[in-house]
Amino acid sequence: MSQSSGTTNKLFKSRQTLLALLKEQGFETKDYEEFSVNEVHTMNNNKQLDMLISNEEGSDKPKKVYVKYHLAKTLRRENINDYIDDLFHLEQVLTKNDTLVIVIKQEPHEPLLNILNQIWESEGIFIIIYNLERLLFNILEHSYVPKHVIIDEAEIKLMKERYNITDDSVLPTISRYDPVAQAIGMRPKDVCKIVRSSKTAITANYYRICSQ
């Protein structure tokens, strides 16, 4: 019973963390915010933990995130292919503007990340995989993590003009698998602004471009 209770508490906390991260990205999370620990326990037993979340109404670029809890067994390429077929092709719940988030019990290993790279390069489908344990806290709330913000094309243009940047290759990179990059939903070629404390000014901005 205690093991079941511990698992339920982890699932409950992971959902809270994911909802907080997605809300920060501009997604409308209220439909999922009021579930209790007992309700999460029941949903886990019935395999109903998945969430489909859209960004806020009136957004210039409508997009969705589908959260899939894959907890029973090791995640394999065939499982990922099945999820892609169901969500992107057969049911067409998601488009290539959207994101599939998969939560697993293991830490994603390099062969699994290589599969995600291949899917992104060949199909343009963006998938984030989280280890359940890493969702027990919100990395964006850590005191040592400076604020990271994905900037739009207009701000990228201004930044390049200001720093006389003519080629993206001169920008420092941040991996799409960096914990903070994942937390803010960065895709390859996205650019983020990092706001850090500075000795010579109250804050200073740094920029990173997302890589595979």
List PLM regions with ranges.
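Extended boundary segments
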Residues: 115-159
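Helix-rich terminal scaffold detector
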Residues: 1-98, 110-122, 133-138
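Short, Lys/Arg- and Gly-enriched loop/turn segments at beta-strand edges
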Residues: 199-209
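Short, structured beta-strand/loop micro-motifs enriched in basic residues and often containing a Trp
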Residues: 166-178
